Amino acid sequence: MDEISYQKFLTTKIRDLELDVDESMAPFFKRLKKELKDHRILLWPDFYFGNEWGCENKTISISIPFFLATPELKTLEGDETKNEEMMKILRHETGHAINYSYKLWQQKDWKEIFGDFNKKYRKGYLYRVNPWSKSYVRHLHYLGDPHYAQKHPDEDWAETFAIWLDPRSHWDVKYRNWPNALEKLSYVDRIMEEISGREPLHTKRKQDGIYSMIEETVSE
């Protein structure tokens, strides 16, 4: 991109950028699709570029930060997300989408293992975590969100699912001395076997904060 083109790029409104989530995220989506296919999980989330990471509550829509779309945007944002870190977050958010699409959070066993899905998120959860607990897996923990699984039952599920889905996690070995965390991982393994090959029950979409609605320019 030459200097003139770059200056024009900086003054372009984000909503006017031509971003293609499938094209930009192709190598990561390829890996994720294979991991899901290996377990015959039929859901493919509704990915889109938005303001930040997140799965819209009780939908299959997952927002990916728009600045991950191109090298130029990543450089401006100062983003240094590595490939494996990207996969960790994608697995986590996909865990939310699967929870919602198959309504797993409504099942008695899910509630007994992870807790009340309708529990309100509280600010400052880090002041209440048990840093020595072996009841929770550690996943986004290593990406700057310490003890994230302790934040809320839905996050506990998503973190546990993400480790289970990672073909290189060796969760049955890594967590063999963490009985409560291992119980959660074993539950994920069991419930995913149950929904294997089954169509999702719920495929509501909601692309909140989609990049095409962002009025700011790239430089802003």
Per-region residue spans from a language model:
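Flexible glycine/proline-enriched surface loops and loop-helix/loop-strand junctions
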Residues: 139-147
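Short pre-active-site segment immediately N-terminal to the catalytic Zn-binding motif
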Residues: 72-91, 146-149
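Fold-level signature of zinc-dependent metallopeptidase catalytic domains
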Residues: 2-25
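Short, His- and charge-rich active-site/binding loops that engage polyanionic ligands
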Residues: 59-76, 120-122, 128-133
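Auxiliary, metal-adjacent structural segments of Zn-dependent hydrolase domains
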Residues: 18-73
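Pan-zinc metallopeptidase signature
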Residues: 148, 153-220
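Active-site-flanking alpha-helical
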Residues: 95-103, 162
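Post-HEXXH active-site segment of zinc metalloproteases
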Residues: 80-84, 88, 100-136
